[in-house]
Amino acid sequence: MSKVCLLTGKKPKYGNSVSHANNHTRTRFEPNLHTKKIWIEEEKQFVKVKLSAKAMKIIAKTGTAELAKLLK
C-alpha cells in the first residue's frame, strides 16, 4: 500500500464531505505523508521512508531506534 505511514500505520480513511445544504458526498481522507531520507545510525546509511507528520514528531523525540527495528 503506497499511502501508509511506516511508523504509525496511518492510512486513508473514508467518510463524507458535508455541504452547507447538508448534502453528503463520499470522499477519501489522505494521511499527511512525507517522503524523508533519514540517517539510521545502526546501519550507517540513509533510508528513504514515507512518514506521517506525527511519526516525524515521534522520531524527533525518541530518535531513530524505533524506525531501525521496523526496517529489519
Curated annotation (Swiss-Prot):
Pfam families per record:
Ribosomal_L28
Q: What family is it from?
A: Belongs to the bacterial ribosomal protein bL28 family.
Q: What is the protein name stated in its UniProt record?
A: Large ribosomal subunit protein bL28
Q: What is the lineage of its organism?
A: Bacteria, Pseudomonadati, Chlorobiota, Chlorobiia, Chlorobiales
Q: Which GO terms describe its cellular component?
A: ribonucleoprotein complex; ribosome
Q: Which InterPro entries match?
A: Bacterial_rp_bL28 (IPR050096), Ribosomal_bL28 (IPR026569), Ribosomal_bL28/bL31-like_sf (IPR034704), Ribosomal_bL28_bact-type (IPR001383), Ribosomal_bL28_sf (IPR037147)
Organism per entry: Chlorobium chlorochromatii (strain CaD3)
GO BP, sorted A to Z: translation
Q: Which UniProt keywords apply?
A: Ribonucleoprotein, Ribosomal protein
Disulfide pairings: none
What SUPFAM superfamilies does the database record attribute to this sequence? Answer: L28p-like
NCBIfam families per record: L28
A GO molecular function annotation here is: structural constituent of ribosome
What Gene3D superfamilies does the annotation carry? Ribosomal protein L28/L24
